[in-house]
Regions:
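Short acidic N-proximal helix/loop "leader" segments that mark the beginning
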Residues: 1-3
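Acetyl-CoA-dependent GNAT
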Residues: 6, 10-84, 88-99, 147-156
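Ligand-binding grooves and catalytic loops that recognize ribose/phosphate and carbohydrate rings
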Residues: 70-71, 109-114
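Residue-level recognition of the GNAT/N-acetyltransferase active site
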Residues: 78, 82, 109-111, 136
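Conserved GNAT acetyl-CoA-binding A-motif
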Residues: 98-108
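Conserved catalytic-core motifs of GNAT/GCN5-like acyltransferases
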Residues: 105-107, 120, 125-142
């Protein structure tokens, strides 16, 4: 899938050095390399990389399947390239690959208004909070669910 200056493809083990670089700059409590290796090794997951014209990773997404529900576990873009449609395209591709009729869940920091707004555009809705979910500062996580397709899925970029 192409979107302007980037392409989305399956995430590969060879992408992990670039993924780790983005991860460390994007999150105060980054995933470990082992966590990424574990998720990529699961055949049922959807693990995607957004790459630029030189095949450099500019964003990535990890979504795991648990029984009948998909859990969006990690999504990040190169900090300097945020708000360029990368996350939106990764989410669109995830839903296309995992199924438009599937159920999805995720957790997001309650202070992350931009991410919450993006998820809402894809039909995710708040379903409560996980108190003190984030270890770095004890912030709550909003639990969001997407239980049915909506007319705005994958809309405007």
């Amino acid at each position: 899938m192409s979107q302007g200056a980037f392409t989305v493809r399956p995430l590969a083990y060879g992408d992990l050095p670039q993924v780790m670089s983005i991860e460390r700059r994007a999150f105060s409590t980054p995933w470990s390399l082992a966590m990424f290796v574990l998720e990529i090794s699961k055949p049922s997951g959807v693990c995607l990389a957004a790459t630029d014209a030189l095949d450099r990773v500019v964003g990535y997404l990890i979504c795991a399947r648990y029984d009948t529900v998909w859990h969006l576990m990690n999504i990040a873009t190169e900090p300097d390239l945020r708000r360029h449609g990368i996350a939106r395209t990764l989410l669109t591709e995830m839903i296309w690959r995992a199924g438009t009729e599937s159920e999805y869940t995720l957790e997001v920091r309650t202070s992350n208004a931009a991410a919450i707004a993006l998820y809402q555009q894809f039909g995710f809705r708040s379903a409560g909070t996980r108190p003190r979910y984030y270890r770095d500062n004890g912030e709550d996580a909003m639990i969001m669910w997407r239980t049915a397709p909506t007319a705005t899925t994958g809309a405007a970029g």
